[in-house]
Amino acid sequence: MEEPNRILFVSQEIYPFLDVESPIRLRNRQLPEFFQSKGFETRTFMPKFGEINERRNQLHEVIRLSGINLIIADADHPLLIKVASIQAARIQIYFIDNDVYFHRRKGVVDADGVEYKDNDERCIFFARGTLETVKKLRWTPNVIYCSGWMAALVGLYVKKAYADTPFFENAKIVVSLDDQEYMTPFGTKFADKMLVDGVLQSDVRSVAGLPVAY
């Protein structure tokens, strides 16, 4: 029997978990719904921002997938995985959570509309956390669709850090960098923070020591 086509959706924002309805958030809900209706297997990931109401959206933690520590900027950051369903669309969403990076903070800006200084680390954590979870699920995507700047590093890690991982070796990467309004560049240490086993200085040389606009 032929293996089903599998698409991994890695999205910065999805409606209705983020309340404001926008074309980007609607698209990130509708794409998995459409492909699943056509017989594709899908998995969908997004950050668990603090503004997402866990009770209303019926999120619950998946203990068997949680508990990994990701080292970023020489500090350990526990990875928590939560899930919820969009019943009308018949799709399940996996949420990447961490008390410092996501759980207590709304979106990518603070209450005054100022972007968080560690958005670069949050971006790294989201990308690595998603791939570690897919690996734990032992799920092999044919296509990885990344929406938003917070998902943009997934391709780098798939091709470098996970180059020898069977689950990702044949995956095609599609990146949609949407026109999102927050544009403060990442700091000059972003390249160093991206480094993990498999990602070399030469892989990030083009942004080393520079502020990185996303």
Predicted regions and their residues:
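Catalytic cores of nucleotide-sugar-dependent glycosyltransferases that transfer UDP/GDP/TDP-activated
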Residues: 1-214
